[in-house]
Amino acid sequence: MQPRGDNLARAPQPERRRIRVRGLVQGVGFRPHVFRCAARFGVTGFVGNGPEGVVIEAQGEAIDAFLAALQEQAPPLARIDSLIQASLALVDESSFAIAATVAGAAAGAAIPADTALCDACLAELFTPGDRRYLHPFIACCDCGPRFTMTRRLPYDRDTTSMADFALCPTCEDEYSDPLSRRFHAEPVACHDCGPRLSQSIATVAGALRAGQIVAIKGIGGYHLACDARDDAAVNRLRSRKHRDGKPFAVMVLNTASAGRYVQLPDGATAMLQSRERPVVVLPARTGNHTLSPALSPGLSTLGLMLPYTAVHYLLFHALLDAPTGQQWLQQDHGLALVMTSANLSGDPLIIDPADAQTRLAGIADVILHHDREIAARADDSVVRVSAGATHIIRRARGYTPHAIKLAGGGPRVLACLLYTSPSPRD
């Protein structure tokens, strides 16, 4: 007869817990991650966006393993700051669900930052036959606009500017499929149901080829663009914008193209390719290259960035005469575009189409709008890489509104910052 005693392993007992997760857990694919972990460990209950982050009620025999997987295998954009648990009574249920968002003040929730187009979406963008082939607003759980389209918290589709675009049946299926990369991805859309451009990419590319200045509505505001190799166009932009000496940022397709124009010290390539996609100030190469000397007059540096939206990639694609396949994305083409903030000197970045149409009329020859509202303006971030270290010069798109954690202790200090750049009319 088998002896009985305390040394025998006890069979796991079901339990139920409420878990409140704070940090960067809204808009980064965290709820789908919770859903998949629940299915993996046989956990029932629900997960939803709440006023203080993400709220989970989990029931099962493997809650600890479930929670360990949540933290150790979190999505790439997620950041867990705290995880608070409380025991609950068991409930008669048999499934796990993504629940409706809990309304209320969002004191503990963090708005995610905008993120550059991911490799998976970039591949789909240039795959003929894919339903999002050449779609200017392709995105998924791992990439796309977040902060700049958020109207209020908690972060859900109906609290963002994507609320204006009802999902088509096919996108709805992807949005509801736990195995899809677009499961509860709020920016999800397609050619049939998503935002639209005011004119074709081909028209804009033609204007750039002709030496014209183009205003382009992006995710956080308008850019002014021209061919960075066209000295007359660059000087014309400088004159129209009344920007005598300040350098212009330049966008190139990839780091192979960047290496043609700048030196790439340790850390520079990684920063250029980072999900934040800032303007990276780097030592300019001297000698015979084709960029206009009016880009950064009197300076030995050049600010470069890589494309971070589908519209940017589509522009390069059109300017290169629509190459097929994917290899062209990594090749050095030498193509370079000025991408500078579209604002009058001293004024904040323009985000409204009507405002852009009026105030940029004397600067831009062509204006490319889209009909997704920019809920929060965000200029391009600017960083400098030196001796392998990154120094942030302007902390904006890609970093905003992530908090900066400070060491404890020291005096209490009140810091105030204007939401937009001051203007003479303020």
Features from the language model and the residues they span:
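N- or domain-start disorder-to-order transition segments that initiate the globular core
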Residues: 196-206
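Internal gly/pro-rich beta-alpha loop/helix module
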Residues: 320-323, 331-409
